[in-house]
Design a protein with these regions (language model features):
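Short S/T/G/P-rich N-terminal loop/turn motif that feeds into the first structured element of a domain
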Residues: 1-209
Length: 209
């Protein structure tokens, strides 16, 4: 599967990027799969806006023949057991999306009361993002709102913490700091606003910019 992505599909993603149809494309591997007999990959299409979207490949004749691409797509399909789609919108952060990403990302999925979405976003962006910027272990951070239609008991947001290596993820989880009174108040407030329902760690397989 990785060879097909590298030798064929990544070249088509690059053509879309050069044409201004997308910012970038990443392929990530889930590190803690619930089904160890299978490998879970995450494909990230970075789109400039909702009006300019490109999940297909457009005209592929300049790169591969129709027969060759059909054969490759059939091979790809024979390896995929299941797939799902998730659309998000970027709400803020300091992840350098136009550059090559770092090696690991930790995704945290948040369920937020529907009446508190604005308050939650402000807490993350105003109160917590500055602390993430000062964290020398973290190479980037982003807040995304999940825009794919979903039930109220499913996640509404995800945060992405970017790290150079797994050791830094462990160090970040192990670190304990004494909190000021204001920091304790902010942390308690965000706990009241959201519930963290899942955490995933992904390792970078390849990226196209």
């Amino acid at each position: 599967l990785i060879a097909l992505e590298k030798n064929y599909f990544s070249k088509l993603h690059k053509a879309n990027i050069d044409a201004g149809k997308k910012i970038g494309w990443d392929m990530w591997r889930l590190e803690s799969s619930a089904t160890p007999e299978h490998t879970t990959f995450v494909y990230t299409h970075l789109q400039p806006n909702l009006d300019t979207q490109s999940f297909g490949f457009g005209d592929t004749d300049a790169y591969f023949s129709k027969e060759e691409l059909a054969m490759v797509q059939e091979q790809w399909g024979s390896m995929v057991v299941d797939s799902k789609f998730l659309m998000t919108s970027f709400k803020g952060g300091f992840a350098p999306i136009k550059d090559q990403p770092v090696n690991f990302v930790q995704l945290s999925y948040m369920n937020v009361d529907p009446t508190s979405h604005y308050d939650y976003e402000q807490m993350e962006l105003v109160n917590f993002m500055p602390g993430h910027k000062n964290n020398t272990l973290m190479k980037g951070w982003a807040l995304h709102r999940i825009t794919t239609p979903h039930a109220e008991n499913e996640p509404d947001y995800l945060t992405a913490n970017f790290f150079e290596n797994m050791e830094d993820i462990y160090r970040n989880s192990d670190g304990v700091a004494q909190l000021s009174k204001q920091q304790k108040m902010n942390y308690q407030k965000i706990l009241d606003l959201r519930e963290m329902v899942n955490v995933e760690v992904l390792s970078l397989v390849m990226a196209v910019r």
